[in-house]
Each structure stands twice: as structure tokens, then as C-alpha cells.
């Protein structure tokens, strides 16, 4: 009996050490500050934002009537149909990107030689180019660019790395292909939200390491950067995040060690690996990057820690935060004044980051 207890204790100690030293990754508390550039600091949430929050409560209520085994299918269908694109002037062209389904999204002012790869969010399990057309159409407008929105492979049907490979394939392809066929790009960008923001940050590090043409600029909206679940706001902002809070409140009650082991098996990669947790990677030598996040959301500290670490490494990274906002509030930009404000900042950033790469040379004036 004594020998068995000693053996069991040894196993527990080994598992604990693996979890602490291998799965969690380095301590990132040194990068909790500064807090970033705050927008609309003293403004209360708009009436439009309060209406958005109320609508999210309706989603949670509807999901309670759906059998658990059908939750993912229901959420996928909801995302694809919840945000229809009302602007008939937007051009949508389906395209095959070296085996990855995708679509070109072009606003009337888009220059086909200016290209932006957009990587949609959805917790790596849902979402599509269709679900994010409101965002891709607006990115095309403010960037004066053709937007390539990819339908990357999702979990659980595919491993996490499959979606990562699709993003890499799309980047290589976009450098030499536009909406009108084979042609070189005059300017290239990448952007994504939430899980797509995670994939965006993973991609720009990979592009640097491969020596490929770097983006002129990148944008990440409320990105997830730490799959080891180390950010304080994951628990601290549960009650103030009306979108992610209700979905992940139950997970917050599970010990972090158990979630780390589950994540290791689910992703087939340790949670702190830089490919899926960009905050743990080398953040030097990155292109100009704008990160936007809400101070009320669960992922705000993922953004702060990533930006502060990248800035310390010498990369030109900017964090802009808004109070009160829901996760990826930019998706609601037709209704939300805060969403329109965020896109004004994005347009300004992309313009300033790509000066001299407009068709026909530099142009004066702001992007509308």
C-alpha cells in the first residue's frame, strides 16, 4: 500500500510539473500594462449598443431550447444568417484559393492591386466568409482594397493546424493573384477577429520566419492570443462580457489544469505553443499592427499582454480600447456609432501604413 501511494504521488507530481512547466508557458504578468489608447473614455454606451446587448440575451434563450448535440450546427447557421449584407453595390466573387474555398469582396472604390486577407472569427468551430460580409465589405471600403475572405477548415471536423495551413496557403496565393486573375499586388494586408485575430497574429509571425513578403499592415479585432488561459480578464470580465460570458461561464468553474490537458489533446499541441498562442512567440520584427478590443470583454488582457510584449520587442504595435463594448463590436458597425468610430481608426491606420502604395502613386486626403 505504501509503495502504491508513493507511486501515485510521483505520478501526480510529474503531471503537475508538466502542467506548470510545459503547458502553461512563461509568466506574462509583466506585460499587463500599459493599458493602451482608450477611446470614448467618458461616454456611456450608446442606446444602439444597449439594443445589441439585449439581442444577445435572446440568442442565449433560444439556444436553451436546442438539444446539446445540435448546438454547434445551430450556432453555425445563426452566424451565417444573422448579419446580412444590405449593400447591393458590394461585389462578391467566389474563388478557389489553391484548394481553399474563398470569396473576393470588393467595395466600389476597391483597387484590385491592393489586397487584404480576412480571417473570420468563430472560436475555430464556426463562422464563414458569409457570416462576416459586413466586416469584409467595410474593410474593402476603408482600405480601398479587394478583400479575400477564406473559408478555412474548422474544428472539430478538422484539426486546429488545418485552419492554420489554409491561412498560410491563402497568403502565398494572394501575393500573386487578384480578383481579376494573376497579377502582383501593390499593397497587402491581413486582418481577423477573435479566433481569426489569433490566426492573423500566428500568420504574421510565420510570414516573417519564412522570409515572405510581409503585410504592409495587420489588424486584429479582439484577438485570442493565449490558449493557456492565463489572462486575468478571462475570469475578471465574465459578468461584463455579454457575448462570451454566458457561453464560457461554466468553463470558468473547471480547474485550469484540466482545461490545459484537454486543450493539449484537442489541439494536438501544447496550449502555450506560439503557433496557437502567439503571445508566447518571438514578437520582434512584426509589421505595423493595430489591435482593437473592449475593456469589458474577457479577451482584453490577451490583447494587452500581446501588444505590450510586442512593443517591448520593438515591433510597431498599437492597442486601442473602448469601454462597455461587446466582443467584436465592429461587426455591428451599421448600427453602432462605436463601430463606425472603430472603422475610422482602422481606415486611418491602413492609409498611414501603406503611404506610397496607392495605384498611381501617393494620394493626398483621407479615406472616406
PLM region spans:
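N-terminal targeting or regulatory segments adjacent to alpha/beta-hydrolase or S9 domains
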Residues: 1-82, 363-368
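Non-catalytic accessory segments of hydrolases
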Residues: 61-104, 110
